[in-house]
Amino acid sequence: VAAYGPLWNSGGERGIYKTTNGGKNWKRVLHISDHTGFNEVHLDPRNPDILYATSHQRQRKVWTYVSGGPESGLYKSLDGGENWIQLKNGIPGSDKGRFAIAISPVNPDVIYCMIEGHGFYKSLNRGASFNRESGHSTSGNYYVELFASPHDVNTIYSMDTYAQWSTDGGKSFKRLGEKGKHVDNHVAWIDPENPDHLILGCDGGLYETWDHASSWH
């Protein structure tokens, strides 16, 4: 699991944690610092020993919120989380905000990555290198979540105040329809048998569409 750590303080349980006995005991297998937590961990659907994790350096105080720093990044493990390498080829080297990634179910060699403050990136080789596709990114305090279509390798959904989607691998994004539903979207499910059947989770609850966002209930 990915652990962000305490909201208002440094330290605490931050990093990637692993259990091998159904949750009775946990071992921290990746840790950066007391100021940096982890917000996502993903498994390659073809090999459970291949994992990807995203770190986010942030500070939240009563008087300010700093979303980013040099310790935000993307990591990969080839041995079930025992050892990790940072993926840097094509990733900005300056201060970075929150990361989101999505592995394409159609072709798991393709990894999408959105970096707060930098844009939208794509890898065709399991993270060995990334190319910047566009400047699209969302607010790391609320969103920065991606969901790849199980039907088309070039279709990706980006959660935002108004949910957006791309059909060209992240080069451009357009809004989904929001008529009849609450905005502020955070999670999406795409039916693996029907690309027009979606469920979105937002601040107003769960909404379902059978006509690809033309109508919701």
Cite the ranges covered by each PLM segment.
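Beta-propeller blade termini and top-face loops
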Residues: 1-217
